Amino acid sequence: MNPGEMRPSACLLLLAGLQLSILVPTEANDFSSFLSANASLAVVVDHEYMTVHGENILAHFEKILSDVIRENLRNGGINVKYFSWNAVRLKKDFLAAITVTDCENTWNFYKNTQETSILLIAITDSDCPRLPLNRALMVPIVENGDEFPQLILDAKVQQILNWKTAVVFVDQTILEENALLVKSIVHESITNHITPISLILYEINDSLRGQQKRVALRQALSQFAPKKHEEMRQQFLVISAFHEDIIEIAETLNMFHVGNQWMIFVLDMVARDFDAGTVTINLDEGANIAFALNETDPNCQDSLNCTISEISLALVNAISKITVEEESIYGEISDEEWEAIRFTKQEKQAEILEYMKEFLKTNAKCSSCARWRVETAITWGKSQENRKFRSTPQRDAKNRNFEFINIGYWTPVLGFVCQELAFPHIEHHFRNITMDILTVHNPPWQILTKNSNGVIVEHKGIVMEIVKELSRALNFSYYLHEASAWKEEDSLSTSAGGNESDELVGSMTFRIPYRVVEMVQGNQFFIAAVAATVEDPDQKPFNYTQPISVQKYSFITRKPDEVSRIYLFTAPFTVETWFCLMGIILLTAPTLYAINRLAPLKEMRIVGLSTVKSCFWYIFGALLQQGGMYLPTADSGRLVVGFWWIVVIVLVTTYCGNLVAFLTFPKFQPGVDYLNQLEDHKDIVQYGLRNGTFFERYVQSTTREDFKHYLERAKIYGSAQEEDIEAVKRGERINIDWRINLQLIVQRHFEREKECHFALGRESFVDEQIAMIVPAQSAYLHLVNRHIKSMFRMGFIERWHQMNLPSAGKCNGKSAQRQVTNHKVNMDDMQGCFLVLLLGFTLALLIVCGEFWYRRFRASRKRRQFTN
């Protein structure tokens, strides 16, 4: 590089460093640059480890490392210190440390280096949990053929197999040769966040051949086969030479579905000739299956010295690259700027680790003799994916529902190097593919809005909201196909030749359009987004999902007339109470008269209460809370009057309270609350039933006689004219339909006439389950059902019902209660009051007439006496 030039990366690094130095206060970087000081490296070879292996590893290491540094370190320098005691405590001046010791000491040394921020490069035994990949480099010495324990251990540590339970099928020979295999599978660690795993181990007798082998495998697999209509989510690990037989038998037992995961290790003797497409040719889409293929070079010669040489070369190469980078940047900036932006110790260690991994990926030979490549199947939605959006519209694979991708590989030095999940569908479901979905216009379940070209531009409704949530939860987009417009020659027009004003209010789901049934049988659609009544599911050429709604039937009649309020003033008391009240008045007046007359002292006798008539008017006036001019002076009389006042208080309070209640809550004539009451209402002469209802089918198998009697007399209607809602308003007809449809009728009439003319029965009967439709061959029925249940638990579906289905409206009980709260007294309420006043005037007139007659009678009698 010329002095006047600067690399773009160096410029960006300079600007970023200057910005950080100005805006963010940082701690001083006290670790020396490679330009001013050599890198410090510690080499620790455990003495006990050398004793166990019977060779002087430290001496070999010293010679190999010095040769590598001398021959390959072109820039910078490295100061190396050697130790033979694994408990040594290194100072923070060291940049990195290379250790050769057993697994336990390796982990102990790693914990110590974290305190002093030293990069650890560990060479250790196999079957050792891998150190954190972003903080250290661990190279287990794996013998050829003994890699299974380390491989499984790495799969758990790196979350390749993040399982909590596993069913393991392993050959007896492999289990004997790898004694630590089971220990690796069940390994758990709090440090590495490895959860414990429940293990079911089945040891395959690999000496069996032919039919005996297949019978034994079938017996073992059948224990984990799903029962009918049962969803089981299990994980299977297969390490066997008989993997093809296991796949074939498991397929016949329906064990390859969206809930199960299969990791199959293909052994070295067959891996080179292995074809995943051939093995899975009979599997249906929806399976989660991955293969680990053995690509170990049988001629590779691995040794500890060779591994030490490769690790040393990778480290020296990394330090040399970083030194070159520092030189290129330092030459273009000032010393102050350099101090602000140069690498910290942790940044250097991270760069060294990445450079070493990149070097080992491309140049490692002996430390990567063992190598396994992992392939996984992409299967979900392959047959229902929209052809316009397919990445490969024409699939030439042996199984068109399977596409195998290479997700990465495993080596002892790097562990798993993966660019994709082992089971991508478990985490990402349909991986954002575009699915074909079938639907029809059927408000309020599916509401489709189309433009002038007939293309669906908006969709809503209960079913469509569920589809949208499924799309979000299962990670797919979708393309809607309307069944009536799928084939032009068979297109169905929903409006041609029809009168919109004669259409029935509401919707039904019992009759599924024939085109929907025909199109869904080809398994080309992920789901038919239509609301369909669940009926005889075992006899249909398709499957129903979990019910998304339950609709009940009811009936609509004329609202009962309100009872006349002309006698409202008598309503608070029963007839018996009124007669009893009259009786106690007639009884109390003579009692008061007698008590007053029997007073022993003449001065205690009240002149105004000396007749029964005057006592009666006194008692009557007290009842009306008017009082009187006279009051008994004797204690006996006062007791009678006092207790009568108590009776009056109770009577008046009770009467007034009940009168308010009767004013507030009107009474109605008896209506039809239950279907079995129809016989008592002779004025209802017409029975109606909507065409195409599940109620018709249900009555054929029910034992309720009132249902059967109704159906015998019912007139099936299919239009608004035949529905004859005016006859219902007149009280001559009753109709049966979904309760929500009847509520919609009541609501529309109320909005138009501002008055409630109809009443719905209190009885709701015949639960009609409504679900969506999936193809009979669909692998995703249980998956869809699981998410529908989740929507129910979260309240989504209930909310969508409230948004799209008609509410009870202003004629229901709650709305009537609101009307009662704001009730104003009108003439209907007060007519009884005026009737009482009229009755009083009439009685007064009659009494006046009687008094005139009596006066004339007395006058004539006196004249006769005078004449005589």
Swiss-Prot record:
Family: Belongs to the glutamate-gated ion channel (TC 1.A.10.1) family.
MF terms in GO: glutamate receptor activity; ligand-gated monoatomic ion channel activity; transmitter-gated monoatomic ion channel activity involved in regulation of postsynaptic membrane potential
PANTHER family linked to this entry: IONOTROPIC RECEPTOR 20A-RELATED, IONOTROPIC RECEPTOR 60A
Compartment(s): Cell membrane
Extracellular face residues: 29-565, 664-832
Xref: Gene3D superfamilies: 1.10.287.70, Periplasmic binding protein-like II
Role description: Integral part of various neural sensory systems in the antenna that provide the neural basis for the response to environmental changes in temperature (thermosensation) and humidity (hygrosensation). Together with Ir21a and Ir25a, mediates the response of the larval dorsal organ cool cells, a trio of cool-responsive neurons, to cooling and is required for cool avoidance behavior. Together with Ir25a and Ir40a, mediates the response of the hydrosensory sacculus neurons to changes in relative humidity, and is required for dry detection and humidiy preference behavior.
UniProt protein name: Ionotropic receptor 93a
Pfam families per the UniProt record, alphabetical: Lig_chan (PF00060)
Gene Ontology CC, one term: plasma membrane
Keyword DNA-binding set for record: no
Source organism, top-level taxon: Eukaryota
Tissue expression summary: In the antenna, detected in sacculus neurons which innervate the first and second chambers (at protein level). Expressed in multiple cells of the larval dorsal organ ganglion, including the dorsal organ cool cells where it is predominately localized to the dendritic bulbs (at protein level).
Residues carrying sugar: 38, 205, 294, 305, 432, 475, 499, 543, 691
This protein's encoding gene: Ir93a
Organism the protein comes from: Drosophila melanogaster
Ranges annotated as spanning the membrane: 566-586, 643-663, 833-853
Cytoplasmic side: 587-642, 854-868
Keywords: Behavior, Cell membrane, Glycoprotein, Ion channel, Ion transport, Ligand-gated ion channel, Membrane, Receptor, Sensory transduction, Signal, Transmembrane, Transmembrane helix, Transport
Lineage: Eukaryota, Metazoa, Ecdysozoa, Arthropoda, Hexapoda
One GO-annotated biological process of the protein: modulation of chemical synaptic transmission
Phenotype caused by lack of the gene: Impaired response to environmental cues such as temperature and humidity. Response of dorsal organ cool cells to changes in temperature is abolished and consequently larvae fail to avoid cool temperatures. Response of sacculus neurons to changes in humidity is abolished and consequently larvae fail to move towards their preferred humidity.
Leader peptide range in chain numbering: 1-28
Coiled coil feature spans: none
Bilayer topology annotation: Multi-pass membrane protein
Tagged with keyword Glycoprotein: yes
